[in-house]
Amino acid sequence: MAIRSEVEHWDVVIVGAGIAGLAAAIALRKDGRSILVLEKSSMNKEVGALISLQPNASKIVDGWNMQQFLAEKKPMVDEAFRLLNVEGKLQVEMKLNTSQFGADRMLYHRQDLHDALRQAATSDDMPGSPAVIRTSSGVTGCDCESGTVYLSNGSSVQGSVVIGADGIRSAIRDEVIKGSASEGSKAIPTGLSAYRILVETDKLPKLEVSEDVFDLKRSATTMIVGHDKRIIMGPGRGGEMFGLVCLVPDPNPDGEGTSWNNPAPLEEVLEAFKAFPAWVRDIMSQAPDVALWQLRDIDPLTTWTKGRAILIGDAAHAMLPTQGQGASQSIEDAEALQAFLSDSDSKSSGDEVHAQLQAIVSARYERASLIQAYSRLQAKPAASKDNKTVQLNPQEFMEYNCNYSGAKDWAKRQREAEEMAYKQTAARA
């Protein structure tokens, strides 16, 4: 089917109301547009975990002027990244500040960030018509050329553009990559699993640790690194909550552990981290429950777009959490949609829309794919087998990841770098 040349309205259909989908809804709000977000769940329970937005994403969110929704969620500025070995000895402290990248690294309860994005997407106080979120609306596929999205109840909706933000098991991805070299690509186990723990800070006992090593009241991220295990932890919700992500070798690499909510016994976690400091196990021991999550990602796809459809977030480039860039890359995707589709309206032909989607992929693909690869590299064993020497360098990819001012600026910088390299090569010839 050919891409149609005319549409009566410029209707945005977003599949998925996670962080990527809601960010896209905010970014694409504009007079003369309608935005429909299709979400398969009832949205009555978001994951209980902490999440960070890196400076590259915080800068974008700041530009959306949604502080009225974020402020009440008690976000925290991450002041430092601290790296310890399993003996509890400080190896690296990396101070974080706004001046370095133009924005702070922000810490949130995931549910709070999700709720703030939902409020901004649907509020009458933001530019453009509010997005409409239709819950309990599972999507089975789409016709990328016509922009028709098919729902599990047998109905369909049509969009001038279709945004596939439906996560690591994306139905839209299956349609976009059909016929490409990536056809059939699915999420793959990475060999790692993560225990997720969230505790109320005021319920924690007094910890037997020097404040120079670890201060529960400090707004900072701490990583404790063993040979094949590590813990990443920090505060959230104004210090009311404290969260831990505890990475271990996947105990069931052939299993289907794709849920956030596979329960795990606390004793299992404490045993896995028995070589780690007693004070961190004291924090773990207060967990009301523990969830085990099998970590999966996807290999870089050969394309993110077909016809009127484009993939963003985990649907396009699911990555490991080892650099904390998953949500931030979703925010970057949303900003790219905003930048490249700024002039798209009811007069835009299908060919014109597709050309802009291709431009988005050109601006985003290499960067997101490289950050995927960096995240895999950061997941490799990061300490000697005796656990005493930490080999991880948290600053290794920081400049590349966080020195970012939007998709069009990034594309311009890349073109300039390529032109400079060409001139240098020509001069040596």
Roles of regions detected by a PLM:
Residues 2-9, 80-83, 87-88, 323-324, ...:
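C-terminal helical "tail/cap" subdomain of flavin- and related membrane-associated enzymes
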Residues 2-12, 29, 54-200, 251-267, ...:
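Conserved N-terminal helical subregion
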